[in-house]
Amino acid sequence: MLLSCRHGASSPKLDNLVPSGKMKILLVFLGLLCYSAAMPMQMPRMPGFSSKSEEMMRYGHFNFMNAPHMAHLGTLYGNGMQLPQFFPQYQMPMWPQPPPNKKHPQKPSASKQQSKTDPAPESQKPNQPQPKTPTPKQPLNEPSPTPTQPEEETQTPQAFPPFGNGLFPYQQPLWHVPHRIPPGYGRPPTSNEEGGNPYFGFFGYHGFGGRPPYYSEEMFEQDFEKPKEKDPPKTETPATEPSVNTTVPETNSTQPNAPNPRGNDTSPTGTSGQGPNPRSNPTGQNGPAVNVSGQGVPRSQSPWGPRQTIIHENYPNPNIRGFPARRQWRPPGPAMGHRRNGPFYRNQQIQRGPRWNSFTLEGKQAVRPGYPTYRRVYGSTARSNPPNYAGNSANLRRKPEGPNKNPMVTNVAPPGPKHGTVDQNENIQNPREKQVSQKERTVVPTRDPSGPWRNSQDYGINKSNYKLPQPEDNMLVPNFNSIDQRENSYYPRGESKRAPNSDGQTQTQIIPKGIVLEPRRIPYESETNQPELKHSAYQPVYTEGIPSPAKEHFPAGRNTWNQQEISPPFKEDPGRQEEHLPHLSHGSRVHVYYPDYNPYDPRENSPYLRSNTWYERDDSPNTMGQPENPHYPMNTPDPKETIPYNEEDPIDPTGDEHFPGQSRWDMEELSFKEDPTVRHYEGEQYTSNQPKEYLPYSLDNPSKPREDFLYGEFYPWNPEENFPSYNTAPTVSSPVESRGYYANNAVGQEESTMFPSWSSWDPRIQAQGQKEGRPYLNRNFWDQSTNLYKTPTSSPHQKENQPYSNNSPAGLQKNPTWHEGENLNYGMQITRLNSPERDHLAFPDLIPPDYPGGQKESHVFHLSQRGPCCAGGSMWPKNNPLALQDYTQSFGLAPGENPDTSIGYAEDSHIKYARQTVSPTSIVPGQRNSSEKILPGESQNPSPFKDDVSTLRRSTPCSVKSQLSQRGIMPLPEANSLQSKNTPCLTSDLGGDGNNVLEQIFEGNQLNERTVDLTPEQLVFGTPDKEPRPEGIPNEMQGNESERQQQRQSSILQLPCFGSKLANYHTSSIGTPSSLGRQDSFDGDPIMPTETPNSLAGLATGAQFQNINVDPLNEDEHTPFDSLQIGTNPQDQVQDCLLLQA
C-alpha cells in the first residue's frame, strides 16, 4: 500500500507510463515490490535461507526460525527448552545481521522477520532488484515501520530485556507465537513440554508454510501489534495494573506466600534467569509491568488488555478468590499433581506460556530427575498439550471470550499481576507447590467436592477455569484435583470415560475438551506416554493418589508402582480398573504410570493393568486366557494390537496414540480389563512387540524407553526393581509377559521376573505365578496363549500345552508369537536376534534394549549389547559365557578368557543367574549358535536329544538348562525361580528353543515334542532339575550330541547366532547344552560358525568341549566349557550373526 501510495504520488508518471506499457511493468514491479516487502518475511526468508533451508528449518537450519516451533518439537525430540534459548542466541547473530542490512532498523517494527527476511533477500537479491527494492522498501517500511519501530525498539528492550533487540525479534515471535497461538497452546517456545503443542508444534512444524505465514502474519502483526500491545499494555499497565494491582494485592497476598520472592525477582531473574521463563516470566517480569512488558502477558494482554481489564474487573474476585485459590490450586496441582497438575493446570494457564514456562522450570525442578523433565516435555506434550492445546485451545476456542477471556486473562492477567505469583508459584512452585501444595492440597480436598469439577474439569477445567472465574477457582482446584484426580482418579479421563462428571460438565467443556479429554484421557490412559514422561514425574505422584504431595515423589509413585505393580494395588486394581475411572487414576494412571514407565512396560502397565488384568485374569482364566490369548495370540490381536501399539509406539512419543492406546488401556481396562484389548494396547505394546513391536516397543519405544528409561530406569528398575533384570526382560522381553507374565510375574514374581513369561515354565509360574496368583495366567498365558499363540507354531506345543512351561518354552518369551513363528518367527527372530535390532526384536522380550540396564536384566537383556547380531553374551556382562560371547562377538574376546570365568559362572549360580539373566541373550547367541549348530543335530535328532535337550533348552530357555543344570538349579523352587528366569533366558536356551524353533522351523514338530517332553518338568524341574545337570539328560544329549553335531553341521547356518551358542549350551547337556551344541560344532567342527569358535574354542575349550560333549562325564566340564565355549563362540556367534544377518 505504501508503495502504491508512494508511487501513487507519481501517478502522472504512472499514467505516462501506462500508455507505454511501462505502467504494467511498474505495477508489476510495484506489486512484486510490495509483495517482496510483505513477503520477504516469508519468501526472502525461505530464499534468503533458501527454501531448502526453510525445509531444513524443521531440522533447525533456521533453528531460530523454528525455535518457537522447534522449541515444542525440539522438546518432543529432546531439544527441549534449550532450543529456544539456543535459538535466541543463534538469533542474536542472525538479527544483528539484519540490522546491518539497514532494514533491521526499519523492519524491527515492520517485521523483524522482514528485516531478517528482507536482509536475506537483500543479500540474495542485492544484485539488481534489491537496490531498487530496498529503496522502495525502505521508504515503504520507513513511513510506518519506523514509527512502529521506535515503539517496538523501545518495547523490545522492555519486552525482552534479556534478549535485546537482536533476539527480541524472535523472542517476540516466540512470545507472540506462544501467546498468539491460542493462549491455550501455551507458549510453544517455552511450551517445550507443551512443546507438545501438537497443534502448535505441528503447526509450526509442518506449518513451515504456516510458520513463515505465522511469522509473516504474526511477526508482522506482532510488530504492529506489539506496539499496540505495548501501547495498550502501557496504557493498560496503569489501567490493568490497577486492576492487576487490585488483583496483585491479592496476588501479592499470594505472591508473598511463595511467589513474592520471585514476584518481582521473577521479572528480572525469572526472565533472565529462567530459561523458558524469560518467555513466560517476561509476563511475570513486570508483575504489574507485565502489561507493560507486553511480552508474554502483554502479548496476551494486547488481546487481553481489554480482557485483562475486564478480567481484572471480573478477575479481582477470581483473582481474589479464584486467583489466589486458583494459584494455590495451581500449586496444589504442582504440589499434588506437581508436574502433572502443574502441566495441566499450569499448562492450562500457562497456555499463555508464562505458567507453562514456570511449569517448565518448575516441572524441570519438580521433575528434577531430568527425564521427568523429558517426561514433562513429552508427557506435557501429550498431556499438557491436550489440555493446553486441546483443552486450552478448546477453552479458548470454545470460550474464547467470556470465561475463556476472563479465565484466560485470569490465567494471563493473574500471570500478569500474579504472573510473578504464578510464575513464582510455578517458579517457586516446587517450594510453593509444596507449600501451597499442602494447604492447597488441603484445599484441593475442599475442592474435592468439585471432584466432578476436577474430573470434568480435568480437561474441561481449562474450560471450566476459563468458563468461570470463580469456578475457575474451583476449577483450578479441580484442575489440580482433576489433575490430581486425573492423577488420582487418573483422570477424569476415566471419569470422562465414565463421562458422568467429566463428560457431563466436561463435555460441555469436552467439545474441545472431549477432544482434549479423550486425547488427554487417552493420554492419561495413554499417560503411559505422557506420564511416562510425567508418570514418573508426577503421575506416579498421582498414581498412588493425588491426595498426598508425597505422591509427587515418583519414588512414591514408583513405590506405588512397585506396590501396585507388585502388590495388591494391582489386584486391587482390577477393582480399580473397574474403578478405573477414579482409580484409573491409580489403576489407569498407574496404568498410565505404568505406561509412563511402561508404555512399553505395558507389562508394567499391564502389570498394573495387567496386574489388574492379570489378577483379574487370575481371577478369571478366561479373561486371562482370552486376553492372554490375545495377549499371546497377540499374533491374533497382534494386527490390532500391533497396529495400536505401533500407533502408540510412534505416536506414543506424542502421547497422542497413547491417548488412544491408553484410552484403550484405561477404557478397556476400565471397560472390562479385557486385557485382550488392553493387551491390544499392552498387547500392542507387547503383542506387537513380541516379535515385531516388541522390538518396536523395545526399540521403537526406545524413545519411550527413554521416557521409559526415565521410567525404565525409573520405573522398570525401580518399580520393577524387584527384578530389574526381569523387569527389563519383561519390559522389553515380554510384551505379553511384561503384560501378563512379566507384568504379573515381574510384579508378582521376581523369580518369574526374569522369565515370568518364560515362566511360562508354568511350574514356576504355578509356583511363582501362583504365588503371584497368576500362575495360570502364565499357564493360560503360555498354555492358552501358547496354545492359541503357539498353536499355530506348536500344535505339538499344544499337546505340550499341558506343561505351560512347555508352551512357555515354546512361546518361551511369549515366544508363542516367536515360537508360533517358532519355526519362522524364531528363525526369523533369531535372525532378528542375529541382527542387533533383531536381537532386540527376537529378544526384545528377554532383552529389552530399552532397558538394557534393567539392572538384573541389564545383564540379561541389556546385552542388547548382545553384541553384533546375536550378542547373546553381551547380556552377560556378568561373567556370562553369553556375555562374553556378546562381548566376545563385539570384541572378539578370547572365548575362553571370560568364558572361563563365565564357565565357572555358568556352572556357578552367578553365571547361572547371569546366564539365566543373560539367557535371553544366551538364547540369542546360544540359540543362534545352538540353532545353527545344534539345530541340525536337533532337527535330525529331534526326538531323544532334541526333545530332551531341546525341550530342556526350550524348557530351560537358555542357559537356564546349562545354568540351572550346572548351577544345580534343578531344585524345582530354584529351578523354577531360576529356570523361570533362565527359562526366559532360555529363550536364549531357546538356543535349545531356538534350535527347537529352528528345528521346528526345520523339523516342525520336534521342538514342540522336545518342549512337550521336557518343558513342564524338565524345564521347571527336571531338565536342569537333574542335578547332574547335563549328566542325566546330557548323556542322552551327548549321545544325541554326536548325531546332533553331525546333523547340526548341515543346519548350522540357520540359527547361527541364536541357537548356536545356547544350543551348544543345551547340546552339551541340559546343564551345558551350549557346550554340547558348541562342542558338537567344536567337536565335529561340523558347524561353520563353530570353525571360528573352534579356532577359539579350538583352544582348550574347543577340545575340551569336544571331549566333554562326547562324554557325559564331562558334562560339568561342558558347563564351564559351555560357558567358555559360549564365550569362545562369540566369534562363532559373530559369524553366526553374520550368517543369520546375511
Curated annotation (Swiss-Prot):
- Specify residue ranges for compositional bias: Polar residues: 243-303, 381-395, 453-467, 787-816, 952-965
Q: Where is the signal peptide?
A: 1-38
Q: In which tissues is it expressed?
A: Expressed by secretory-phase ameloblasts. Intact enamelin and large-molecular-weight enamelins are limited to the most superficial layer of the developing enamel matrix, while low-molecular-weight enamelins are observed in deeper enamelin. Preferential localization among the crystallites in rod and interrod enamel.
Biased composition (Pro residues) is annotated at 128-148
Residues with Phosphoserine modification: S53, S191, S216
Q: Where are the annotated glycans?
A: N245, N252, N264, N291, N462, N929, N1040
Q: Where is this region: Disordered?
A: 90-347, 374-513, 543-587, 603-662, 787-820, 921-965, 1020-1049
Q: List the InterPro entries hit by this protein, alphabetically.
A: Enamelin
Gene Ontology biological process terms in this record: ameloblast differentiation; amelogenesis; biomineral tissue development; positive regulation of enamel mineralization
Specify the domain of life of the species encoding this protein. Answer: Eukaryota
The entry's propeptide annotation covers 277-514, 666-669
One GO CC term of this entry? extracellular matrix
Positions of modified residues (Hydroxyproline): P547
Pfam families for this protein? Enamelin
UniProt function note: Involved in the mineralization and structural organization of enamel. Involved in the extension of enamel during the secretory stage of dental enamel formation.
Q: What is this protein called?
A: Enamelin
Q: Which organism is it from?
A: Sus scrofa (Pig)
Q: What is the lineage of its organism?
A: Eukaryota, Metazoa, Chordata, Craniata, Vertebrata
In the UniProt record, what gene is named as encoding this protein? ENAM
